[in-house]
Design a protein with these regions (language model features):
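Conserved phosphotransfer microenvironments
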Residues: 51-69
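CheY-like receiver
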Residues: 115-140
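A Lys-centered signature of the CheY-like receiver
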Residues: 98
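Conserved two-component signaling phosphotransfer/partner-docking surface
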Residues: 101-107
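Hydrophobic/aromatic residues positioned on beta-strands within the core alpha/beta folds
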Residues: 79-80
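Conserved acidic carboxylate
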Residues: 9
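Two-component/phosphorelay signaling modules centered on CheY-like receiver
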Residues: 12-31
Length: 140
C-alpha cells in the first residue's frame, strides 16, 4: 500500500494543485481540509501532511501540525508563503515556500515518507534543524 497524505490548505486551487502533484508521484491523498477541525478528523492515520499556516479559521496551521504529529505520528511539512509565522517548528520536518514547484512538493513528499528527494530539488525544501535553524536539502 502506498503512503497517504492529507492536505491542509484553504485555497482550493492550491490544494488541488498539491493533490495533483502528490497523486502523480504515487501518493494517495485522503482528503483536503481548510480548517483545524476537519484536519484533525481526517488526518489520523495518514503518513504525512502538507499544512499551510494561515487557514480558514486563522493561523492554526502550527496547532494542527502539533496535534497530528504528537497524537497521530503524522510527518508534517508546512507549505506557506509566510515561513516567519512558524514560531514552533518542533513537530514539523520543514517547509516549502509558496509559490512552489512540482519538484519541491515531490521532494518534500519523499522526505516525509522516508525516501530520498530527487537531486534536482536540492534547494526546494527547507528542513528544520536543531534549535529551529533551517537548512536546505542537499543533493547527493
Amino acid at each position: 500500500m502506498g503512503k497517504t497524505a492529507i492536505i491542509v490548505e484553504d485555497e482550493i486551487f492550491v490544494a488541488l494543485d498539491l493533490e495533483r502533484i502528490l497523486t502523480a508521484a504515487g501518493y494517495s491523498v485522503v482528503g483536503i481540509a481548510a480548517d483545524r477541525r476537519t484536519a484533525c478528523e481526517i488526518g489520523r492515520g495518514c503518513d504525512f501532511a502538507f499544512i499551510d499556516v494561515n487557514l480558514r479559521d486563522g493561523p492554526t496551521g502550527p496547532e494542527i501540525a502539533d496535534t497530528l504529529a504528537r497524537e497521530h505520528n503524522v510527518k508534517v511539512v508546512f507549505v506557506t508563503a509566510n515561513p516567519s509565522q512558524i514560531i514552533d517548528d518542533r513537530q514539523a520536518l520543514g517547509y516549502v515556500r509558496k509559490p512552489f514547484s512540482e519538484s519541491a512538493i515531490a521532494a518534500a513528499a519523499a522526505i516525509a515518507s522516508g525516501g530520498t528527494p530527487p537531486p534536482d530539488a536540492a534547494n526546494d525544501v527547507i528542513l528544520f534543524g536543531d534549535r529551529g535553524r533551517a537548512s536546505t536539502v542537499m543533493s547527493a
